[in-house]
């Protein structure tokens, strides 16, 4: 027992990830105080420490006075590292320390009576290990572990000595996982009665844990709130579609569910039938198998996760292959919405960046690896400040700080989900699709271009495939006819760079633009001067049946287009806002297809991640499903499209590579260098030749480089691989291109050549676009350069950046070390200092190669936690 002056108090301190158990703890404390006078129960959430240093200080102070400590769900290094010394100190003086469902080093702090998990395994622990059995990857493994958790206390009950404290540990876990008010109360009664010392309280017995379904259904309209029978759920008489909703069992049992209730109500208001399901063990697959998947296919039209975690693994890890297998079998759109745990709603609303690094990793990046799309904030906790995210100005701080819904964001989420779900149910011939082309740089004759892609050839093949699929579209006969219809048509009549599909009058713009004041502050009165005749705005493009091929308007700053994209306080032009509103409301698009890399929508002003109602990408696209054709080698910018414009990306192959060769000027320089290399060092003409080389080098911007280094540089330039031509969707690589790909990817390895040849020949890109337009699941794939990351094959998948807990990879570390050594060898003496610019895109494409180079130069190596996740770096001892 602790030794301090507060002898009348007895303090139970719970340190965990979030505050979902704060409500039960607050509600049961008065009942506990009737039997245990002076007892207090305090919960501290590690998620609050990053943005609220005072919260960490309060936790630290509480641990100094703790009599019983319960620590769980602490897995992140930024949570474990700072609190670990205080947990260690508390362990030495408290009556009991219970570490469960948490990082291994915290579990080993467990001290309950004779049970000390910091010591070598005892006979009881060996028995436990044998009873646990093997750990399998299937969804059933979690169910088996929960059954074992219930069985073990019954078995251990008959073993003497230390086994009884081991039984107490398992019972504590069982109470916690069934975290209702009753179970939290009985857990605390059990621990205090068994382990409190120096007290004269009467011994009380705790009731056994109440068992709740590990896999079940929740709905606020149910009498008991939870059930295991689908037939018990309320269902609209004529539902537009059915949506499967994944919720956290712990929040449902803790009665912290106002945010779930608000989502269910908003979805049902959209005419959707909602199936809110939960599963224990932070593995959503059992819920999918039980309630979303039938014997003949999916029983839902879309699936939405409200957990804020990856589908399989939660905050500790993510088993993305298992998640992808389950989601591919379900084959419906998978949307990941997230509650804010690491900041309040007011902090998020006021933030220019939106989500912080840890939130972005846990709430967005890890679900993306599973194949999740449309990341949307839907809830959070209120602090003392009013949320300024929208006109509602929500507030509502309480002592327990329960989860609060964000009504505006939930409305946006409901719109997105309803559109995706009904898209899947719609008849192909009824679907209206808007395909968006770009022109960048503006005013440079680049309308209808995209990086690495032959746009009009690819678009023509796509339209032909859509017609064959049953879409109401009549493609022009040839590629040139398509190009002429879009870029010429009536363009000359209106003095525009492309065909005019519609004219939107200034009065219409004024009446129907919700953010008119912001646009006019930047661009003057409507209709502005961009793509305008002074009376209104032109919408450029051409319509082919129910498919509209539109051209995204220019940014507005022709001389400096990046100004609009990267400076805060700006707004898109009248033409830009009108274009997307016209596609949504006047053309009536059911889905958008942004065709190639890349447009400007995702770069418009707003938060970096965790979009709010004031963010322009969110305003412009609204709830429209957004399919985005993207080059497979650019995951960094594709990630922006996914996180800022709700894009479901579909990768396409980059063009075949060829040796760059040398052009005029460089060829002449090479000839001179050849002569220099063949000239005797003592020859009289050597000095004259070196002067000529210096002149030729300066003419091609290589001045100041010694001839020997110039020779190496020219050879590297000549042999460099560059894209050869443009990629065409629906066209398999010809023999020469195929040979070029295979030589680079596989060399002389016959088995690899056959494997890559099959993947390269697969016609997967247009079929993937059609699947996305039909509301099907698009499997994820890490993006990257084809040479370094051949796993991008086959294309036609949903690109993501990287697992932030797995970068740099082992290969990247070795390659980075080689690059660091080459850098040092390029200098005659060891440099005193080196500056590196670490570009996100370069690291993403190389799995962290530049980071590996930086670590090698520093003399450090990455540090990984007990789950194999990158958690920091350590200096390498000089002895090594």
Give the positions of each predicted feature.
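Ligand/cofactor-recognition surfaces for anionic moieties
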Residues: 1-880
